Amino acid sequence: MSTKIGFADDLGVSSTEISEFYKVHYQRDIALSDLGFHTWQFEKAPINRGVNSCVVAANDSGLLGVMGLNRRKFYLSGNAINGAELTTWIVDQRIKGTGVGTKILNFITSHFDVLFGMGISQDALPIYVQSGFYYLRYIPRYIHVVDTKKVLNISDHTTYASKLVKDSSCEQHHLHAEKIFWSDQRHNPCVEGNHFSRSLEDLIWRYESHPYFKYNTYKISNSGGSFGYVVLREEITDDVKILHVIDILGSESSFENSITFVENYAKNEGFWAVDVYSTLSQLNKYFNYRSWLSAVDSSFINVPHLFHPLEVRNPATTSLIYWSKSPDVKFCDVSELYVSKQDCDLDRPTMDFIGVYNE
């Protein structure tokens, strides 16, 4: 019985079939098995135009494997190229070891110029590396502590952490912050570094049509005319009150103003802490300068990065794989890459969250 590999829509495989495959074959319940989230992720993304972009392996008996894939333009040194974000990869355990997973990956690398994925399992890592992917074990994650006592209570930490972690002391600022909607804007924002597209169409889909999460976007400006944008998501449960920075957009000259706004916003609104993921050195130097904790380097504390349910992992961040059909030094310079919590399905709701949302 022959096995076909291809894009789901080309092989006549529906989102319902794929989400059901995730439900049956993945080791735990994940949002990709929720049809509402699955459809938003893989059909409603602007470049997909209503067509499911996942890559599947199938024969006459049905699905054998799936790689979640979202088509997305990638800008390398200012030039748009054919890119994709990879997410959860799953093969029916009954055919594991037959090469179907590798065939799926080979199909994908033959159709794109660059690929990125996060949260790589140890089982999948050897296949990625053998296929020419680069691997970053830890994506930089920074944490700004507002309420030390509450953060220590939910974290793993050393006995001396309380001497090193202090409550936020935000300075006075003269910034103007305006809540905006991307659907009201006329121009794409400036984005530093090599990055996935942040066109208005992308941002409207990502932040204003999400089936479960609510995002707030602020435009931050000062008297000198510099302005930038921050996208925030509030994580408020019985166990935690954390502010997630999902995106920081604008030229480098706006970065510190945006971070200052976030620190003050978190303190004024009673959040316990703020966290942000970023690979871009132009941005990360400001987190270091402003003494944000590092999930990788601040070994005396491990602040949770999973919240439904609350869970501490070591380290409290995730990994990145990246691949280029024609790699060069510029592509391999991760310090020039801007990947944030916005990208590669990193800000995905858990099924626990979806269950609470639907109550």
How does the language model describe each region?
Residues 115-166, 231-256, 260-359:
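Active-site/acyl-donor-binding loops of N-acyltransferases
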